[in-house]
């Protein structure tokens, strides 16, 4: 009888332990990138050109979903329980396209689908989006590059790159993400200042070619 009680007691202890472990399951927190929306589109003037925007590329480690930090230039770490809700590449692509659309330089700005019914194609790369934990203190770094090609000639008519960094006052992931958002906004603004431009001569040639 005593042995049975001991066995039952052990089983109950194990079950209680398992329940405790189940209650301690940790779920990921998800974060979004956000920048203020661009102003309403301005008047288009005499330029009549269509721009297609390819999805921005990025290094493989930025496509894993987890927020990235670096403890040295060579070492990359991941916050496995702090992840992006959406792919940062798609966010940057849409944010850049929205601002180009609002700039009024092009009659239409649309996602690139491989069709030749556009005048220009813009492509780019999100090169850095990470927390930096070396060189004293904590900061975030965002780096973006882009170029625009005239489809009819294959000529690169515009290119730019930018790298922005900002300190993080409080080291926790929500604060890091907030600083990343602000730094991303600055990086996109500088990338597109000055942004792609289309001359009236190029626009006129495009119109003649489409007739």
Model-identified regions with their sequence ranges:
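Extracytoplasmic/secreted envelope proteins and their assembly/folding machinery
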Residues: 89, 93-97, 103, 181-188, ...
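A structural "domain/chain start" motif
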Residues: 21-89, 197-211
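Surface-exposed short loop/turn segments
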Residues: 22-41, 98, 103-155
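Bacterial N-terminal signal peptides that target proteins for export
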Residues: 1-10
């Amino acid at each position: 009888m005593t042995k049975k009680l001991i066995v039952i007691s052990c089983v109950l202890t194990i079950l209680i332990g398992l329940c405790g472990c189940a209650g301690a399951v940790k779920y990921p927190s998800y974060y979004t990138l956000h920048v203020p929306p661009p102003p309403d589109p301005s008047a288009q003037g005499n330029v009549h050109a269509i721009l297609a925007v390819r999805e921005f590329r990025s290094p493989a480690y930025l496509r894993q979903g987890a927020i990235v930090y670096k403890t040295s230039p060579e070492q990359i770490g991941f916050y496995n329980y702090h992840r992006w809700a959406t792919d940062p590449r798609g966010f940057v692509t849409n944010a850049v396209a929205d601002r180009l659309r609002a700039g009024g330089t092009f009659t239409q700005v649309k996602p690139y689908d491989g069709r030749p019914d556009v005048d220009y194609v813009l492509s780019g790369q999100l090169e850095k989006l990470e927390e930096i934990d070396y060189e004293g203190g904590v900061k975030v770094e965002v780096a973006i590059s882009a170029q625009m090609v005239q489809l009819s000639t294959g000529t690169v008519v515009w290119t730019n790159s930018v790298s922005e960094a900002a300190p993080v006052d409080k080291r926790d992931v929500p604060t890091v993400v907030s600083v990343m958002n602000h730094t991303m906004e600055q990086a996109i603004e500088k990338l597109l200042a000055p942004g792609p431009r289309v001359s009236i001569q190029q626009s006129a040639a495009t119109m003649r070619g489409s007739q």
